[in-house]
Amino acid sequence: MAKEQIAVAELVLNMILGKTGGTRVDYFPQKPDFPFDAVYEQAFVRATPESQGISSDLFAALLRELDASKDTEMHHFMALRHGKVICECNFAPYPKGMWHITHSMCKSITGMAIGMLIEEEKLKLDENIYDIFPDHINAFSKIFRPVITVENLLTMTSGVTFNESGIVSGNDWLGSFLNASVNGKPGTEFQYNSLNTYVLSAIVTKRTGETLTEYLTPRLFGPLGITKYYWETCPKGITKGGWGLFLCAEDMAKLGQLYLQRGKWNGQQLVSEYWIEISTARHLKTQNDTYGYGYQLWMEQRPGSFEYNGMLGQNVIIYPDMDMVLVTNAGNKEMFQDCIMLNIIRKYFPVNYHPADVLPENPLSYSLLKRLCGELENGENNNRSTSLRGGWKRNVVSRRKHSDKKYSYRISAAVDRPSDHHSFMRAVSGRTYVMEQQNIGIAPLFVQVFHNNMTDGISEISFTYDAGNFYVSFTEGEVIHKLPVGFGRAADGCVDLHGEHYLVATLGEFARDENDIPVLKLEITFIEECVKRKAHIFFHEDDEIEIRWNETPGKKMILAGLSSITEELSGNFLYNSLLGDHNITTELLHRLMEQTIEPAVRGYLKRPEETDSIDTDE
């Protein structure tokens, strides 16, 4: 495993040293654009909470607390009871009906596929994975390997040391997993490892000749009416299985409702009752005081309850005793089950809570709940600018590099009044700045690493005020991301990252810092993801700017992951040589990584004679 960890250290070192470009893993664009025009199929019936036995006041209080907590960053919330949607809220600027990255929540879907394979008699729980993939490991090595079964993968007890960090080390993830060392006796100790799920996906492909996505489309996604989804593959074409799935919140709810209905949907048995029974049973204890683990899903606090769980707040919580499903998408700063968001939800649905069959309708409470959801969906000061049906399509303006606007480097006296947005916009319009340090990307590091889509580095930034609209343009490699900026409410746009288009919503604010320096604050939300990019642009004298970058959630988790790797590598010769070549200690590495996550870079005004082409029209 040291080789893979060194690859991570090498990637981190390249970031610190300002080296842009790829990793050891081949990149190819694969993410499709969100299918705006696709018709949504099999939507749930909507009902009032009271008609299904729960008070509107309960949901209103829950949503307020989730929104107010400094430890939560809510994106989508949905609640079902008896198969009907009784509460749904989309927190600005995340729109209703948009797919969202699910992270590890999709592991539970991979588990469903394994159950289907077993039902079709194409696989057995006790099969040795080395027998399934005989061509990926040499016969001599196999002699000294313990038996690792399909069930060990399902319960996260394989003990294989090749884990998530290894995916940056090369293209052959399956071969690396099968040839990696094993800690302990398989089946005895819970060690969460997303590559276990990846290998389950590879097993589906091995036994069927189809990718996991191809296998599930007619068996699961199609019957459920799930059409707006995308699941990433590895460089070898195997569906990632344990991460990389984009899915809409209501479709996540369908997957929970399917298990409430014992695997049956519209009269068709999609997942066997036997599989649901054994997969939702606790097979072993887990760390961090969670409630146990089944087959690719987690036990929850209420007796008999369980959840499909993904980091940063992607959850489908199933309460069989209440015939209820809850769905969350979020960008929290915490990883798994032991988090503030889930604790807040548990507070409102404790073990001793039992909803009624039906409650009297309460028009006032329901009206207040709907108003609250509207306020959260609009954000403070109505924080939405364009409709889902057309806003991003109109604002997709990433394009190949060229200059087509009149150049101006005048800053008027209006800069002295930054609260006057339009005066400030006019003052900076037409100005282009060349960045001194050109290794920062528009995408957060989380997006870059998870999708193996590394930045080419922002070289220029420019500002345009046109017909009452304000734009900030970032030149990154050969692409210009021209982002409309909303003030008071976010404006919808799109960025082109090496052929993959990511929808964003950009919110701006003009202010002054404690030294009376004008500042443009930008919050760039990647609305299909869990993360936001933040930039504070300081307009100094002498035609100079400084940009202080940040991302959320970010530094805490990135540094925690780095710490676990550097601790394991502290005595490794190659690792120490790698750092020694650059006179970097482990302590300095962490300090430099902090600066890489939250860099401050300067830019200098680009004069007319430096501009590629100048439009001189007045």
Where are these regions (language model features)?
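N-terminal leader/targeting segments and the immediately adjacent pre-domain N-terminus
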Residues: 1-95, 118-123, 363-438, 445, ...
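Active-site-proximal binding-pocket segments
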Residues: 216-217, 221-280
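Active-site helix/loop module of the DD-peptidase/beta-lactamase fold
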Residues: 120-158, 179, 210-243
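Active-site SXXK
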Residues: 83, 101-126, 153, 200-204, ...
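Substrate-recognition/cap regions that form aromatic- and gly/pro-loop-enriched pockets
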Residues: 432-554, 560-567
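A small/polar active-site loop signature that marks catalytic segments
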Residues: 158-233
